[in-house]
Curated annotation (Swiss-Prot):
Name of the molecule in the record: Argininosuccinate synthase
Keywords: Amino-acid biosynthesis, Arginine biosynthesis, ATP-binding, Cytoplasm, Ligase, Nucleotide-binding
Pathway: Amino-acid biosynthesis; L-arginine biosynthesis; L-arginine from L-ornithine and carbamoyl phosphate: step 2/3
Organism per entry: Nitratidesulfovibrio vulgaris (strain DP4)
Quaternary assembly: Homotetramer.
HAMAP family, per database record: Arg_succ_synth_type1
Catalytic activity annotation: L-citrulline + L-aspartate + ATP = 2-(N(omega)-L-arginino)succinate + AMP + diphosphate + H(+)
GO MF term list: argininosuccinate synthase activity; ATP binding
GO CC terms in record: cytoplasm
Amino acid sequence: MSGIKKVVLAYSGGLDTSVILKWLAVTYNCEVVTLTADLGQEEDLDGVDDKAMRTGASRAYVEDLQEEFARDFIFPMMRAGAVYEGRYLLGTSIARPLIAKRLVEIARAEGAQAVAHGATGKGNDQVRFELAVNALAPDLRVIAPWREWDLRSRTQLNAFAEEHGIPISNSAKQYSMDRNMLHCSFEGGELEDPWNEPGPNSYVMAVPMEQAPDEAEYISIDFEHGNPVAVNGERLSPAALVKKLNSIGGRHGIGRLDMVENRFVGIKSRGVYETPGGTLIHIAHRDLEGICIDRETMHLRDAMLPRYAAAIYNGFWFAPEREAMQAMIDVSQQRVTGTVRLKLYKGNAWPVGRQSPNTLYCHDLATFEDCATYDHKDAAGFIKLQGLRIRGYKKG
């Protein structure tokens, strides 16, 4: 690709991106700058910059993006209550726009002509990275080595690494794993047969249900304008709050999901996901909305949710339709302030109490006891008017 003198690479320090780093430098005869993003994946990133430099990078950025990730990406998605195909809380999908954003910002600062990623040609991540770059910097070129090179197997990657002096880990991985503070995902290996039960190595953030405590635990989550702000009365930063709930939910085996989903590229794929803290936030937030948002606003928002979730899953975080939906959602969240009490037990979380200064719940209207506020006779006219359309349709 002519005209490329400098590339910024999303770099994890693993075999794939280390090979990509050297391959870019050799193939394009260009300078390579790396970005390693700390999104709370609980990996030891000490030395990853040194490894990048030894492998041929001219500069290596290692950045702590945890608070930005929680505040500007996880929380807006949680305010929407986004769930893909009714089950998936989008833990991998929501991380890609932030990484792409930083790639673009570093490319601008470094005067780079291109960015590069290590996503394969079969998955969703290639789409997510590249659509984000298209939105933020359409003039930048995007290099996707897995779509260009002739390295097609782990054996070939290892051979390339040995040829160029790249250190290789001898530990074989059972699964392809992706982790950040919101979730951990597992794919490949035995999971490629959808009949196989996930093995014990697929438990990282949450314990197996059989190992969860035999006694229930009660917790409270406070929200302000749709954002979680405190756990058990303790105010925490966005990232610290997610991590706190990961610890609580994980020890009760909460947030495990095993599903076959529809990738944007048209392939069905089986994934096992752990999202303990995100699951608790999602359940509590949805419950609090029940007393804070009026019916029509809630139903309008709910009608958009499949489209909103698909926008994130498919890589359209920076697209105008996602931003427009977010604006409507955030208006709906202005009243969502209050506290939800959850009961946690062996993989389950139930809301058992909720309160809000903005509650729309009226005890006098809801009670089964005698009530002067509501005249039961008024329902007859309401039902008659609602039935006009149906009676006319059936008669015709």
